Amino acid sequence: MRTDSFALRHIGPKAENLQEMLDTIGVESIEQLIYETIPDDIRLDQPLNLPKAMSENQYAEHIKKLSEKNRVFKTYIGLGYHQAILPAVIQRNILENPGWYTAYTPYQAEIAQGRLEALLNFQTMVSDLTGMEIANASLLDESTAAAEAMALLHAVRDRKQKKDDVNKFFVSQQTLPQTISLMETRANFLGIDMVVGDHEEFDFSEEYFGALVQYPGKFGQIFDYANFVENCKNANIKTAFAADILSLVKLQAPGELGVDVVVGTTQRFGIPLGYGGPHAAYFATKEEYKRNLPGRIIGLTKDLDGNNALRMALQTREQHIKRDKATSNICTAQVLLAVMAGMYAVYHGPKGLEYIANIVHASAVSLEDSLKELGFEQLNSAYFDTIHVKANASKLKAIAEKHEINFFYPDAESACISINETTTTDDLNAVIAVFAELSEKKHAEIEELSERTAIPKNLERKTEFLTHEVFNLYHSETELMRYIKKLERKDLSLNHSMISLGSCTMKLNAASEMLPLSNPQWGNMHPFAPVNQAEGYQTVLKELEHQLTEITGFSATSLQPNSGAQGEYAGLMVIRAYHEANGEGHRNVCLIPSSAHGTNPASAVMAGMKVVVTKASENGNIDVDDLREKAIKHKDNLAALMVTYPSTHGVFESAIREITNIIHENGGQVYMDGANMNAQVGLTNPGRIGADVCHLNLHKTFAIPHGGGGPGVGPICVAEQLKPFLPGNPVIKTGGEKAIGAISSAPWGSSLVCLISYGYIKMLGTGGLQQATEYAILNANYIKARLNDHYKTLYSGERGRAAHEMIIDCRPFKEQGIEVTDIAKRLIDYGFHSPTVSFPVAGTMMIEPTESESKPELDRFCDALISIRKEIDEVSVDDSNNVLKNAPHTIHMLTSDEWKLPYSREKAAYPLDHLHDNKFWPSVRRVDEAFGDRNLMCTCPPTEEYAEA
């Protein structure tokens, strides 16, 4: 065995297993399997033009050398990004721990109670600091959250406002520039007339339905918004604040003013800058708007025994169910980062956060005092952490950069200096020395921080926060480590067993790919630092763009979108911009197959498109005749087709090139959803099938971990004609010559985790990437063959093969009273996370094993499903007290003095022998979804309620 081959470590099946797997499938070779799976006319005839694979050791040396090309200055740029201190106990036990970063979104609540509790802590932290009633479990970034706030306030207009088409939304010019740009992008096709101006001159016209202000403003000034909010209320204008999370420790909570929505980022709570992300945004609002809240919400409920349990609440709001009528297209959020930010608050507690905020504020005040002594005027009358100093910007910049210091320069005559948690008195004195050099004056050094405050009394926070016990218990490293481990043990992730979620691609997230994330040379780079200071990042990002462009067969790539849903939206906006540039801005019809992922129609609506659904044929494929008929019918207004390939049914449809040709013949562009790209890499590509743009899920195909529900990266790759329209950024120039507005806050989105995909491609190389795809298809077809006598596979290709996933039909079991949910919960007793349930077909399971799973693990999974199939045969329709209906079974049930169930404890907990050696115990019984929605509670319950559990 070659110990220097990363492909051998990444791909699960061993060489000695291969023939047995092929025999089970009924083919002689992998080549034959691929031939029978992928249509002849779309297979690539040349290998990918990428460098040969690096070993893990070679890659470690390579990425280290690149990191040294990043010149990480002391940076005081601010603009929503501040260097923070990540406590080592959180870095070691969460960020670097596969028990946390390999988990999936907590749809199966019984095996996700740990991260659900961590997310409830996050929601409680946000609710407390903002003074709002309800918060979600994170969004992608602050700018996206602000755009979602605008969309929510538009959705909750009263009946008269909707009747009168009140569509104006005011945004303060003090809002962060990237937020304004992204909101303008979003408002464009939502029928919202967004007006940017001075909030002090706002006329409170009845033409407005909402307004957003920054708190504090982008240059650091704290404004007293009390009268503004009151006047908005009187004019029936709802208000949103974009608030700095750390400043809320010292400033009046927006909720006390009667604000409707508060958004922001929690990056300051210990999360590395990472050249733009990933970071967890927050979104808090009033309870009356709970059904319009974007993203996931964690709420309290009960399990079958009446014990407290947690689960994702109000899931009917989500795109999978509401589709084009969903509250938002957001699916992936930033769970891992939200967990870390929440743990930062748990570790420091209210007193620790006050200490940090006080030091930051005192440092800013002390710096102002020292600069005034040098003769510089400071423009902010009230501030928390940022001072705005009058000075010759070009001269100051030259001196500062010579001393490896970055400021923000809003104009030619001033600079903003944002203090952060890492700023020391030595750092302050270095800043003072720069201004002294500029003024050619001697200066005195700061020895002790000032006790003066720059926050007016009426704007100081007077209410308590983080009073719940969880924020006041775990302040030693020992206690926090044990608390984190206690939560981790409640969750099933890839470090226990395979997670076969269809359309989710839960593959290995290799340690070699993950290690660079902890390197401060990558972590401490500000996204708005001058590009020449980020040579290491620029090298990685440009090469990754090239790699993805080659893999997809397109001409250019943008890494900016922070999730697959955001990538979908970006791709559709690029198509709209293309049509407008051609004088065909009226093209707004988007054809979407009925089987499409729910984010597709939700994204299309956000892009201002009219969704027209096309039928599926009996075999699950797109009905080509129906598609042609609708394309011709709408040819004058056809903008795009959204198509997933291979299909969401797990099939390479042979008519795909005919389908894309129909769209092009009728004036449209083809958008390919890249959710299933793991079945294409190296064998075919979106360009080959005739698509014009696709998004990729780097958190699926390219090994970024799911993190329990984020981070994600959803880059878009485009054909030549769409290249000029790739998204831009108002602070650092990115994108095409005719760039659409910002899609994410940061110029290159979540740059830090792009290192993972870069490493994945570098270490697999051309051959390894193709091999990974082949083995993903092999593993799926092996499972299909093993289950063939026990479950019906709904869809197959023309030669009887699945792509990288397949759907098994569980609907016939209703005759015995068994639902697909019962099978999902019973799989927990066997130590497995359920496959994807009821998508894209209700009453089914979609299974995707990925290339990373070994034959023994595939066999354990198949054995579990076969055993469950036998259990189904043992029950009758009148029997509701059986091993499936009562699943999952907890250790509390098994060790109870009483056992009144009609089957043995052994059957309940150890249905297969191997479980005696490696048993995963769910911490709660089956949760009551309806109870949780009827009794919504989205902050930490009182301690006595935990005691009842």
From Swiss-Prot:
<dbReference type="GO" id="GO:0016594">
    <property type="term" value="F:glycine binding"/>
</dbReference>
<dbReference type="GO" id="GO:0030170">
    <property type="term" value="F:pyridoxal phosphate binding"/>
</dbReference>
<keyword id="KW-0663">Pyridoxal phosphate</keyword>
<dbReference type="InterPro" id="IPR049315">
    <property type="entry name" value="GDC-P_N"/>
</dbReference>
<comment type="subunit">
    <text>The glycine cleavage system is composed of four proteins: P, T, L and H.</text>
</comment>
<dbReference type="Pfam" id="PF02347">
    <property type="entry name" value="GDC-P"/>
</dbReference>
<comment type="similarity">
    <text>Belongs to the GcvP family.</text>
</comment>
<dbReference type="GO" id="GO:0005960">
    <property type="term" value="C:glycine cleavage complex"/>
</dbReference>
<dbReference type="InterPro" id="IPR003437">
    <property type="entry name" value="GcvP"/>
</dbReference>
<dbReference type="Pfam" id="PF21478">
    <property type="entry name" value="GcvP2_C"/>
</dbReference>
<dbReference type="InterPro" id="IPR049316">
    <property type="entry name" value="GDC-P_C"/>
</dbReference>
<dbReference type="GO" id="GO:0005829">
    <property type="term" value="C:cytosol"/>
</dbReference>
<dbReference type="InterPro" id="IPR015424">
    <property type="entry name" value="PyrdxlP-dep_Trfase"/>
</dbReference>
<dbReference type="GO" id="GO:0004375">
    <property type="term" value="F:glycine dehydrogenase (decarboxylating) activity"/>
</dbReference>
<feature type="modified residue" description="N6-(pyridoxal phosphate)lysine">
    <location>
        <position position="700"/>
    </location>
</feature>
<keyword id="KW-0560">Oxidoreductase</keyword>
<dbReference type="InterPro" id="IPR015422">
    <property type="entry name" value="PyrdxlP-dep_Trfase_small"/>
</dbReference>
<dbReference type="InterPro" id="IPR020581">
    <property type="entry name" value="GDC_P"/>
</dbReference>
<protein>
    <recommendedName>
        <fullName>Glycine dehydrogenase (decarboxylating)</fullName>
        <ecNumber>1.4.4.2</ecNumber>
    </recommendedName>
</protein>
<dbReference type="GO" id="GO:0019464">
    <property type="term" value="P:glycine decarboxylation via glycine cleavage system"/>
</dbReference>
<dbReference type="InterPro" id="IPR015421">
    <property type="entry name" value="PyrdxlP-dep_Trfase_major"/>
</dbReference>
<comment type="function">
    <text>The glycine cleavage system catalyzes the degradation of glycine. The P protein binds the alpha-amino group of glycine through its pyridoxal phosphate cofactor; CO(2) is released and the remaining methylamine moiety is then transferred to the lipoamide cofactor of the H protein.</text>
</comment>
